[in-house]
Regions:
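Acidic, polar-rich low-complexity tracts and alpha-helical solenoid repeat scaffolds
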Residues: 2-5, 17-180
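Sec-dependent signal peptide hydrophobic core
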Residues: 5-13
Length: 180
């Protein structure tokens, strides 16, 4: 009798486990759920759901944009710059042809320079950016960051005076430059 009771108990537990697992959520369901968490400003749950989406659907065509989004949430909402850097590094490693790689390289360098104060690592990533993406729209920003790497923002001349001028090579006259 004891043996039959054990068998019934095991079968019941297996059945309960199978029912509780339920069907796997679709990528659309997970994405909608993560967006909802973001709207509710529950950023840790949003990241967790985005990570589940990437783990469950690693070949989804938008997986690279999800990793970029995770990096942005860590950076902008949680101020967790180490994890932001890790998300951007993961994006570059997993998706070497992603359209987000240039932005991710920039963000890695930016966080090392401005959030973590590791100018050696910042320089490494900024130089890598310029080598790979010399014509990218962010290249001038990267060059500016490199030119002012390690400087206190309050000691940069044009920021103290509120004007940013560069010498015009042709005439020698100062040429206003857009700071945006």
């Amino acid at each position: 009798m004891n043996r039959i009771a054990s068998l019934i108990l095991i079968c019941g537990l297996v059945l309960l486990f199978m029912i509780s697992c339920g069907p796997k959520k679709t990528k659309e369901q997970l994405y909608a759920e993560a967006l909802q968490f973001e709207k509710q400003e529950n950023f840790k749950e949003a990241i967790s759901t985005y990570e589940q989406l990437i783990n469950d659907y690693p070949r989804a065509i938008f997986a690279d944009s999800i990793l970029f989004k995770i990096g942005q949430i860590y950076s902008n909402n949680l101020l967790d710059f180490e994890n932001a850097i890790n998300a951007h590094k993961q994006l570059i490693k997993k998706f070497p042809e992603s359209k987000f790689n240039a932005q991710s390289l920039f963000m890695i360098g930016y966080h090392y320079a401005n959030s973590i104060n590791d100018t050696t690592m910042a320089r490494q990533y900024y130089e890598k950016f310029l080598k790979i993406y010399p014509e990218h729209e962010l290249a001038s920003s990267v060059q500016w960051e490199l030119d002012h790497l390690g400087q206190d923002i309050n000691e940069i001349d044009f920021l103290k005076t509120g004007t940013f001028e560069e010498t015009n090579q042709d005439s020698g006259n100062p040429k206003p430059k857009n700071t945006n």
